[in-house]
Amino acid sequence: PYMQQWLGYAQKYSKDGLLRQWPSTEYRNWYLGDWATPVGIDQTNPASIDVVNNSFMVTCYQTMAKIAKVLGKDQDIQPFVEKAEELEQLIHKTFYDPKQKSYSTGTQIDLIYPMLVGATPKEELPDVQNTLFAVTADRFKGHLSAGLVGVPVITEWAVKNRQADFMYSMLKKREYPGYLYMLDNGATTTWEHWNGERSHIHNCYNGIGLWFYQALGGILPDENEPGYKHVFIQPQLVESLTWVKIRLMDF
């Protein structure tokens, strides 16, 4: 019930089927998209915030359908599936620019999130993916350029689409922004911001961890056998890496 109530709250602030700005608190505006992005990316741009949040809503509906299945509430499955599909179509219709082959502001998360949740039609996927590669190379100089929301989204997409070389090419960059930039500047834990502002022990960018054991290590969970009772071993090889060592501790 609580998850359904939260979805009801989100729907309360939806207009024409799309989630829009909801009320701020005295502390701050909590209708955020990506957060703690590198300098030069406007995380306050409404177009980016809306495509990110509505893509997240698709994830919520898809997850609720899975939960309903696990709980044996078969009557709830199809309504959530339909809501997810309806929102997928709205996202593409509203935020996609067919001339630019791009979504919203064209940042990495704006391009990847719709692809990840299934909002991008199959026939458009190659074009959007090529836009992503071009934007990463030209606008972002080959760097992973996202915040705490974008990093796990990009990571999940890279794992599912076996884009190990693309991800590795970004991770090995030593200049700002990047993980090696942190290490080269004395970091022993991940920072709150890519440039080192504020906290130097934060969980903002830890979503990258998934890539190491699911892509390089290739240990993928089986949703039909939860709790790692059954796994798939499908390592994604990167040409310039000579070895990877990984182990899974299950309980």
What are these regions, as identified by a protein language model?
Residues 1, 55-74, 112-123, 153-161, ...:
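Well-ordered alpha-helical scaffold segments within catalytic/enzyme domains
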Residues 1-53, 70-116, 123, 173, ...:
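Active-site acid/base region of carbohydrate-active enzymes
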Residues 20-50, 97-119, 149, 153-159, ...:
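Carbohydrate-binding/catalytic loop surfaces
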Residues 65, 92-93, 134-137, 176:
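Amphipathic alpha-helical segments of tetratricopeptide repeats
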Residues 81-82, 165-251:
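Non-catalytic C-terminal accessory modules of carbohydrate-active enzymes
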Residues 124-136:
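Alpha-helical repeat scaffolds
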Residues 139-185:
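Repeat-solenoid scaffold signature
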